[in-house]
Amino acid sequence: MKTTDTLRIGENVYEYEWRRKPIKTLNLRVRPDGSLYVSSPPFVSKKEVERFLQERRLFIEKASMRGLTLADGTSVHIFGKEMPLFIEPATRRHHACITENGVYLYVYEKDNRDERVNLYRNLLKETAEHVFPQVLARLYPVAAPYGVPYPQMKLRRMRSRWGSCMPTKSLITLNTYLVIAPLSCTDQVVLHELCHFLEPNHSVRFYAYLSRMMPEWRRWREALKEYTPYCL
């Protein structure tokens, strides 16, 4: 079920979309256009959703101000580092690259935001394809003593989660948007998914395993929230 409505939060009025899903917690995303997307368990009421939004006022206001425009002269984040963004005309084919000086998007039409967004997303995917297998190889020895098999890895652009897994297929899936966050955030997500090979639910035993593998996991899980506004 989908509900669309508006809500005054502080001095601003926000449009929000609310969907009930088979999940256990309320989730919030601030879209690039400033609207809000909320997903909730089936039993949650509209009153509870709006109270949840009011409680997240500071996050919403901060995220709304930081929305990513991908305009020339603005900035993007790569592995947690803020880097200047340059929009340049493409001479042959449009493409994107990361240099020491910043991130470059070579475009056919400078005012075409869709082209910039697609190039940016492709850049994150290509970077993830290069870096994340190395992250898994580095972290696997931490999980191996617990009997976790070496998994296959898939990469996807996802809206509602940073990672997922299918232990029966020995598979983990990582969100390509993790490229924008510090590598320690990706470490936390990878180890989180590997712990699900040992415990399918978020039980006490699950978090005990995760705490052994990465004692500071809470810090990096919390840090990931800062990068949600940059997920286009």
Stretches found by the model and what they are:
Residues 1-188, 197-232:
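Active-site-proximal or metal-binding-adjacent scaffold patches in catalytic folds
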Residues 193:
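Walker B catalytic acidic pair
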